[in-house]
Regions:
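Acidic catalytic/metal-coordinating carboxylates
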Residues: 32-35, 58-61
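CheY-like receiver
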Residues: 112, 117-129
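The feature encodes the CheY-like receiver
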Residues: 12, 29, 55, 83
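The short loop immediately C-terminal to the conserved phospho-acceptor aspartate in CheY-like receiver
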Residues: 8, 48, 52-53
């Protein structure tokens, strides 16, 4: 199961539809980090796909608080942010994977399938430097 968090409704719709076509069960969608935490607590999904830059409660808030609920939660961060301070904060919170926006939906699905099929989740595989 998957929850998707992004403040862009078009991205939420696109990802939801594509993931459903790929046989992923999208159990929740939200538009900020607070909704991410609430949806995670309610559904305990296999995957959280979350944007970082969102109004009010950003993805860092969401990631920090999901980590408090479950330090081993599988959280995939989507970011278009080039701010090194923010990127360092994200890395410190140890998301399962960080993908740069724009991220082709096929790449995201490939990452989800790789993680789903691995017996032990890899350490954070960051493409940010």
């Amino acid at each position: 199961s998957v929850i998707i968090i992004d403040d862009d409704e078009d991205i939420l719709e696109l990802l939801s539809e594509y993931l459903l076509l790929e046989d992923f069960d999208v159990v929740g969608r939200g538009t900020d980090g607070l909704q991410a935490v609430n949806l995670y607590a309610k559904h305990t999904p296999d995957f959280v796909i979350m944007d970082i830059a969102m109004p009010t409660y950003d993805g860092i808030y969401g990631l920090e608080n999901i980590r408090k609920l479950n330090p081993n939660a599988t959280v995939i961060i989507l970011t278009g942010n080039s701010d090194k301070t923010i990127n360092q904060k994200i890395i410190q919170l140890n998301p399962t994977r960080i993908l740069e926006k724009p991220c082709p939906v096929e790449k995201l699905v490939s990452v989800l399938k790789t993680i789903k099929n691995s017996t032990s989740y890899p350490d954070t595989m960051s493409i940010l430097s």
